[in-house]
């Protein structure tokens, strides 16, 4: 056993986590990010699939690395051939931007116009839909969902982990009520700004486009924010039009890293399989 562990560790000695950043014209500041580069990246000729993984509220770009254990997860999934060797980009547009164009920041524009072009120019990543996916936890799940619904032509799959998709409004305990994106000039929570950005304002147009983004939705059964119900409602709505391209899992846990890490371990292989189907069908 000791030999196999050592051999496994050695096999992934060359996978790396590096820190990077790019200036965003949309935000007027930088977008810091951590980037996972798989073993063999430095000598590879063919471009790699890229996965964008978004953090939760009041966090930053290091959360998937430091708390989410993404390097170990990716290394192990790749070793088991459950995940194509991939570049994983973990950016931050700010601790409370919710990845939308809101009252304070144009974070959605920043991702599309600044982040994606930077990554695809600097890193050896694919630039086609079948080579690009997105996932996120809580606020990041909210963001991953919105990006998938509004720009389905960009993503081959999405991971929606414990998504903070409160319909019609967030609970009093939600960080969203304190976010500058959803606060008016008087400092009060702006219900119209929340409603405008929420996935419910995007899903009809998504369905009309007809381009399906397969989605893995997962939440904890003891989530104190009621997300297990919100996620179930999302699943049921998507199930009406993409029955074979949406999954929902409820696991034992709350709104915490045990659930978020489990979501990545379970969700990334499924997302990968969906992207591979698209890849082969081109």
Give residue ranges: language-model regions.
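Non-catalytic cap/lid and distal C-terminal segments of serine-dependent acyl enzymes
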Residues: 12-282
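Bacterial N-terminal signal peptides
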Residues: 1-7
């Amino acid at each position: 056993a000791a030999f196999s562990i050592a051999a496994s560790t050695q096999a992934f000695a060359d996978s790396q986590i590096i820190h990077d950043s790019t200036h965003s014209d949309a935000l007027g500041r930088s977008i810091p990010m951590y980037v996972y580069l798989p073993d063999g990246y430095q000598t590879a000729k063919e471009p790699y699939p890229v996965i964008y993984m978004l953090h939760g509220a009041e966090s930053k770009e290091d959360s998937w690395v430091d708390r989410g254990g993404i390097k170990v997860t990716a290394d192990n999934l790749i070793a088991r051939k459950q995940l194509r060797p991939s570049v994983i980009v973990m950016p931050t547009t700010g601790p409370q931007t919710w990845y939308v164009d809101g009252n304070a920041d144009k974070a959605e524009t920043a991702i599309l116009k600044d982040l994606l072009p930077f990554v695809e120019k600097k890193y050896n990543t694919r630039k086609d839909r079948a080579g690009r996916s997105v996932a996120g936890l809580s606020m990041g799940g909210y963001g991953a969902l919105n990006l998938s619904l509004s720009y389905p032509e960009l993503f081959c799959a999405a991971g929606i982990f414990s998504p903070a998709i409160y319909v019609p409004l967030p609970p009093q305990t939600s960080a969203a009520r304190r976010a500058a994106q959803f606060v008016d000039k008087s400092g009060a929570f702006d219900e119209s700004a929340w409603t405008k950005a929420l996935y419910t304002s995007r899903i009809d147009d998504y369905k009309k486009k007809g381009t399906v983004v397969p989605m893995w939705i997962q939440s904890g059964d003891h989530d104190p924010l009621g997300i297990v119900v919100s996620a179930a409602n999302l699943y049921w709505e998507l199930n009406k039009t993409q029955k074979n391209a949406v999954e929902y899992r409820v696991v034992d846990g709350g709104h915490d890293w045990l659930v978020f890490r489990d979501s990545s371990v379970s969700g990334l292989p499924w997302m990968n399989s969906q992207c591979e189907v698209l890849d082969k069908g081109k």
